[in-house]
Amino acid sequence: MAYMNRSDLDKLKHENIFSGNIIEDAKEFVFGSRKIYTDSVDDLIELYSLAKYLNNENLKDVVIERMDYVCKYIGKDNWSTIYSFYKENGLRNSFLRQYINNNIEEICNTDQFLKLDVDSVCDILDNDEIVVTREYTILNMVLRWLENKRVNIDDFTKVMFVIRFKFITYSELTNAIEKIAPEYRQCLQDLYHMKITRPRHFDN
């Protein structure tokens, strides 16, 4: 990290890149003895962006530590924001993943899930520890995500690869085919016959 003083951070306020209170929190952490106590996910995300801007590894570590704590209180209203923070910064959090796996049906019924890109949907659903009653539940989640979307055939194939088709009945496949756009139907049939076999943690 290049040397800077308090006035350098004060000048940063005039650039309108970061919020004034976020800069103050960073300043007190870097030059004072104040710890990061905020429970606001949005504030922590902005603090982490500032830490990267300043190239301050200590501040980054403290923000991650605080986010790990806040993550223990994750819920359906903030899961996607927390998930995006970890994914976009190449970070992992076992509690976050456990929450997603155990609450996948509730999560996939949120508007936040429907707004995810294909990579995030695959990252979330292509997990052997997801707890569902049957594989058709996962297929329906993908179909719901695809509603009102037009993805190219490569992305369609990619997202369908999260389905373990060995555990999908032919009648369930037929029902799914009726729900998707015509241009995807042959691809879905082909994937079904490939019979992706990796099991999940089915909840009995």
Curated annotation (Swiss-Prot):
Record keyword Metal-binding present: no
Inducing or repressing factors: Expressed in the early phase of the viral replicative cycle.
Key words of the record: Early protein
Pfam families linked: BACK
SMART domains for this protein: BACK (SM00875)
Domain of life according to the entry: Viruses
BACK domain sequence ranges: 95-177
Family: Belongs to the orthopoxvirus OPG030 family.
UniProt-recorded name of the protein: Protein OPG030
Source species: Vaccinia virus (strain Copenhagen) (VACV)
Classification of source organism: Viruses, Varidnaviria, Bamfordvirae, Nucleocytoviricota, Pokkesviricetes
Encoding gene (name): OPG30
